[in-house]
């Protein structure tokens, strides 16, 4: 099997050296070239035709975002962004994902060499995922049509959503058309700390419903979406007659914290047939067992179809496990989940 050919673009000579060490330490990939800026990278892309590009967000001569936008228009290819953990860095990274980047890795703030080398397996996994990702499914999505407001639903009704690679844009596409009469939504997207708040704030500006990073102990309200904070699990709990959110630092599940399975299992237990579960694009199997638990508890469950997924891993695993009632295109997810939650349609298996 041929190796994954990687080209790294970063203005830091140290970062280029570290990325080369990391990529070349894995037998299934190789660093074919590095570039100090996008202008040099343009010629190297033509010369080496890499499978995956790693791209620093902030660089001289040409900004990483400007280069990414031009690249996706003229020569689309899988890109993994390399970002700082600052507030500005997280906002720029979210914009990069909107423009078509597949995923991102974060630079440690201290001890760059030791920190990046510690991330070696994670970086390799993101490069492998990017190499297999569907670029056709990851074209920038147009704003979906706003759905008509439906009847106000019981506060017992809620929707749980899980996603990973490609999920930030998929979630935006699902939330943007939702009317204020929507039930509460609990969302777990695999993301590091710092990024989830920026992600929630970005969505809050784009959506009619309120979107925020979830906080421990807060009451779950209709017309609001709650994003699990990075590196912390989110569960649905009860306080008397009301739902509330529980945030905790339990061990990683399926190598993830936050984990979709943790959310889905809690929703199965607390909401049962009053819930709809949705699993979107992502690598791995997180959420499959939890979605089966939701279906067995009477919830209606939806999976994004392969044609519209950047990575079909998580939906495929949930389908194969028998946890999915219906498979739909991303463009139909919002409408279908609202239709099912309004009709109260649920089945037991």
From Swiss-Prot:
Entry GO terms, CC: cytoplasm
EC number: 3.1.1.61, 3.5.1.44
Catalytic activities: [protein]-L-glutamate 5-O-methyl ester + H2O = L-glutamyl-[protein] + methanol + H(+); L-glutaminyl-[protein] + H2O = L-glutamyl-[protein] + NH4(+)
Domain CheB-type methylesterase as annotated: residue spans: 152-344
Domain Response regulatory, first and last residues per copy: 5-122
CDD domains named in the record: CheB_Rec, REC_CheB-like
PTM notes: Phosphorylated by CheA. Phosphorylation of the N-terminal regulatory domain activates the methylesterase activity.
Modified sites of kind 4-aspartylphosphate: 56
Active-site positions on this chain: 164, 190, 286
SMART domains to which the protein is assigned, alphabetical: REC
Keywords, alphabetical: Chemotaxis, Cytoplasm, Hydrolase, Phosphoprotein
InterPro entries attached to this UniProt entry: CheB-like, CheB_C, CheY-like_superfamily, Sig_transdc_resp-reg_Me-estase, Sig_transdc_resp-reg_receiver
Matches recorded under Pfam families: CheB_methylest (PF01339), Response_reg (PF00072)
Gene3D superfamilies: 3.40.50.2300, Methylesterase CheB, C-terminal domain (3.40.50.180)
Localization annotation: Cytoplasm
Entry annotated with the keyword Phosphoprotein: yes
GO molecular function annotation: phosphorelay response regulator activity; protein-glutamate methylesterase activity; protein-glutamine glutaminase activity
GO biological process entries: chemotaxis
Recorded family membership: Belongs to the CheB family.
Described purpose of this protein according to its UniProt entry: Involved in chemotaxis. Part of a chemotaxis signal transduction system that modulates chemotaxis in response to various stimuli. Catalyzes the demethylation of specific methylglutamate residues introduced into the chemoreceptors (methyl-accepting chemotaxis proteins or MCP) by CheR. Also mediates the irreversible deamidation of specific glutamine residues to glutamic acid.
Domain notes: Contains a C-terminal catalytic domain, and an N-terminal region which modulates catalytic activity.
Name under which the protein is recorded: Protein-glutamate methylesterase/protein-glutamine glutaminase
Organism from which the protein derives: Escherichia coli O157:H7
């Amino acid at each position: 099997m041929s190796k994954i050919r990687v080209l790294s673009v970063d203005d830091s000579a140290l970062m280029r050296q570290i990325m080369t060490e990391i990529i070349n330490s894995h037998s299934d990939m190789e660093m074919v070239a590095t570039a100090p800026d996008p202008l040099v990278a343009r010629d190297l892309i033509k010369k080496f035709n890499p499978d995956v590009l790693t791209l620093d967000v902030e660089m001289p001569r040409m900004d990483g975002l400007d280069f990414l936008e031009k690249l996706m228009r003229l020569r689309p290819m899988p890109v993994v962004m390399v970002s700082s953990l600052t507030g500005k860095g997280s906002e720029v990274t979210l914009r990069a994902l909107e423009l078509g980047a597949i995923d991102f890795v974060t630079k440690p703030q201290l001890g760059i060499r030791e920190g990046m080398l510690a991330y070696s397996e994670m970086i390799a996994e993101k490069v492998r995922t990017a190499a297999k990702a569907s670029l056709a499914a990851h074209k920038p999505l147009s704003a979906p049509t706003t759905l008509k407001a439906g009847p106000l639903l019981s506060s017992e009704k809620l929707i749980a959503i899980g996603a990973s690679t490609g999920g930030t844009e998929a979630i935006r596409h699902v939330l943007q058309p939702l009317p204020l009469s929507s039930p509460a939504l609990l969302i777990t997207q695999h993301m590091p700390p710092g990024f989830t708040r920026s992600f929630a704030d970005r969505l809050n500006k784009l959506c009619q419903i309120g979107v925020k990073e979830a906080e421990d102990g807060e009451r779950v309200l209709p017309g609001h979406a709650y994003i699990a904070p990075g590196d912390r699990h989110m569960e649905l709990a009860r306080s008397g007659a009301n739902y509330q959110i529980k945030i905790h630092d339990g061990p990683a599940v399926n190598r993830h914290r936050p984990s979709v399975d943790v959310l889905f299992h809690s929703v199965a237990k607390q909401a049962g047939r009053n819930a709809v579960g949705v699993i979107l694009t992502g690598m791995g199997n997180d959420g499959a067992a939890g979605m089966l638990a939701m279906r067995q508890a009477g919830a209606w469950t939806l999976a994004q179809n392969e044609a519209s997924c950047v990575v079909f891993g998580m939906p495929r695993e949930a389908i194969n496990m028998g946890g999915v009632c219906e498979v739909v295109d991303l463009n139909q997810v919002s409408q279908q989940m609202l239709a099912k939650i309004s009709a109260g349609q649920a089945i037991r298996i």
